[in-house]
Amino acid sequence: MPAAGRISDRLSCGDFIKTGSADVYADGLPLARENDITTSHSIGRDFWRSVKLVEGSSNVFINNRPATRVGDAAEQHCSSSCHVGKVQKGSPTVFIN
């Protein structure tokens, strides 16, 4: 089972999870859900805006939204040639189906 995604966990694109549940936590950090937002990031002169998390569990919900896990994706940052980030790091103690 994949680890639960939380605020401050990193995505493969360089973003971090920025928003999460106001009342459900793992390891002292709010858990992330589908439609929560990532941070923006830049590399050199390139800048990528914040995007929403677009995947989550089909059977675990936090505040009526699918729970985000390691491997779940965020929206594409720009055009079809741009990268898509996936949650890379999650809770070491909470795992979600």
Set out the residue ranges of the language-model regions.
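Intrinsically disordered, low-complexity proline/glycine-rich segments
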Residues: 1-97
